[in-house]
Each structure stands twice: as structure tokens, then as C-alpha cells.
Amino acid sequence: TTWKAYLYSVLTTTWGPVPMDAACKETYGNVYYYNSEAEVNMQILRWLDTAVDIFDPEGEKMLKDPFYPGTGGESDIEKWRKFANSLRLDIAIRMMNMKKNPEATTLAREQIEKALNPTNRNYLFTSNDDNAAGRYGTDPNADVSLYYERILKEFDLGTKLETELGGLTYPAMNEYFFCYMRSFQDPRLSKYAQQSRNNNTVGAKYESEKDYRAVVRDSLWSTKEKRFVQVSYRIPYLPRFEMKQTPSGWLTGKDEHNNDLQSLYSTASVSIEGYTYALVPRDFIKQDATIKLLTWAEVNFMLSEIQLRKEEWGINVALPQSAEQYYYNGINASMNEYGVTTGISEYLERDGIKWNTNGLGCHDYRNFYKADINGKGGYKNNLQQVWKQRYFATYFNGYAGWTLERRTRVMLSLIHISEPTRRVVI
């Protein structure tokens, strides 16, 4: 039931209305009944409510549990119960946005209170050992990760050159996410991305006396000379920037003396050639890569959000820690999850990261996107800190990032409306 609840939560969050009541049933006349997203989520909460209540560590177990195995390989029922209750909390929080459906928000409110009552609070994730995470297999022809099948397999088989690592297919940190990592000197950066390097050195032996960092050639304004000057400098991480230098909708500049000649400002780009991007570490896409579905860090950020919004939502819960404490717990849980041991205390003291502070961030190379964190000035600003840290903690989990952004719009993702279909691209 818990696994079915999770799968349906992904289906309805991704596509909206989906068949539930009529799933796997014979239909006539090509008529198919879809349940609304609210209906699906309400049923999911009912399933999870029942699951949390009936899980019995002393009862029957799956002998070979691939998801939450105990010491002998059998199901760890306590971990399954923690997953069910933590998932219930996550889905109920999402449903509080369904203000046009009072029945859905009423049930969500009830389930948040039930998930956090004195008994069920014990059935939330309390360490990274509780994280809901699946793992792919090692058979290249059957159960390896999709990224391995599409990307790494070609390198391992020798059908693709190692110097193509910087290509468009290999996942890398994008410029907008990197703005936050760089602006606030996030110690998770080295865990989230590999350092950029000269393509000619990929797979080769490094020489300690040489500098392999990417070289950037750029035009910067000289306050002394009062003009733009050409400069070159090295950077350890080269984020993947949007390949389209002139975005859709950009009014291209023209030279005022020649209508056929574009001006210097027709595109916004810098010259970076022959270097790999800040590629994701191999562990994220290897054959038996781990796929994290829900984590301890996320649970802490949920609790922080609830502490901030319980009056707004009319929720009667008494949690043992403050929103600020849960916020810091979430950051520390994420650091622990990725094995970060240094730079954490300094990070937590930086403006924008420290609770109830504002932090100014850098912008992308076209000056479209700025990585500020405005956490000062009341609970709505505190929420921005909580949501953005949750987004950072779910790196390389596209579903988690999409779900949070869809609900909060906190990352202010660049959105383009495609005509004439009015298709929204984020």
C-alpha cells in the first residue's frame, strides 16, 4: 500500500488527473475515467493513514525486501512505517495549496495533525539511514540506471571518446543552481559536481605542477580606465550555461550605423572552449546508482515549514523544536547525507543562510537570474530560506525539485510561454 501510494503521488503530481478508480479495468467505447489530482491525493492519504496504523514489526514480513531490508534481508517494518508517515506529511503539505477544494485541504489538515501527534511523531525519519532510496542493479542489459544506459555505457564500451565527456548528454550542474552554490560558498558543491578540466586531460595522468582549471575570457568594466577590457581567468567549476545565446523573445541589438550589423550586445556570452563542464559525480549515474525518493533533510524542512505556517493553516500541533531549529537540522542532515564534514559552521553563519537574514548572490552570465536569499522580515521570508534549502538538498532529484517549485515558485525559474500552444517550459 505504501509503495502504491508513492507511485500514485508521482503520477498525479506529474500529470495531474490520472486513472485510479478505473485503472486496469475494461472500458467500452474508448471511454476512460480519470480521477482529479485532489481525488487521487485524498485516496493516497487514506492509504497511508491505514498503513501507519496497521504496520506491525512483529507481524508478517517480506523475506527478501529490496527497499528496506533488515539485518537478515527481511522487511524492516519500522522503516516502512517511517516512510509511510513521512510521505503522508509531504503529500498533505502539498495539498494545502488546493484552496479551491475545501474537502482536500480539510483532509490534509487532519492528516498533518495525525502524522504529528505524540505517537506518530516517532514514525518520521530520524536519520539518513531512514531515507527512502532505491538502487539500480548491475546487469547492463536489464536493470542498470537510465543515465548509465544512455551515457556511461558508451564510455565503458569504448564506443564514445572520453574527450566527449563535456557533451550535452552528460548531466552537469546548470548555471542557475551554481549561482547559489558559488554565492554562499556551499560546502556541498564538491559533492554535487566535478571540477572542470581541460578536455585533453580527461582520463590522463594529472601533473601536480599544472593548472587544469577552465580558462574564461571575458570583457569586464575597468573603473580606472573607464572602458571594457579583455581579461582571462581560471575557474574551478564551469556550470553548464544555456546553449542558446540569444533567448527566445530577446530583441537583438543592432548597430545604429548599419541595420545589417548586430551590435556588441546582441548576444551575452563569454568564450570558454575545450573544457568540461561541472559534471555530476559518477556515483549519481553509475550502474547501480541510488535514487533518493524522500530524505531526513526534507522531513526537517517540512517540520520547519509547518511551524511557520500552522497558524495560517489552522493546524493544531505542538512540535518540540522551533522552525529555526528544524531549518538548521535540515541543512545539517543534508551535509551528513553527502559526507560533508568541513565548512559547515562557516556556511551557517553567512548572510542568507543564517536564520532570518538576507544574502545577496551573484547572477548568471546574461544577468537574467540572481541568486539572492531574502530570509529577513517575517515568516514568509523565513519560508524562502526553508524552501530554497530544501531545493538545494534534493539536488539531482528532478521530481522533488519540480514538486517544490510547482508548489512554491520559490526558485523563480525562468519560464517561457511557447506560442501558439501556450506551452509552459520551465
Model-derived features: positions:
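C-terminal structural cap/anchor segments
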Residues: 309-401
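Short coil/turn segments at secondary-structure boundaries
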Residues: 193-195, 398-407
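Single conserved hydrophobic/aromatic residue that forms the stacking wall/gate
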Residues: 415-426
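Residue-level signal for alpha-helical context at structural boundaries
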Residues: 23, 62, 341, 348, ...
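Structured, solvent-exposed acidic/aromatic patches
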Residues: 1-333, 379-381
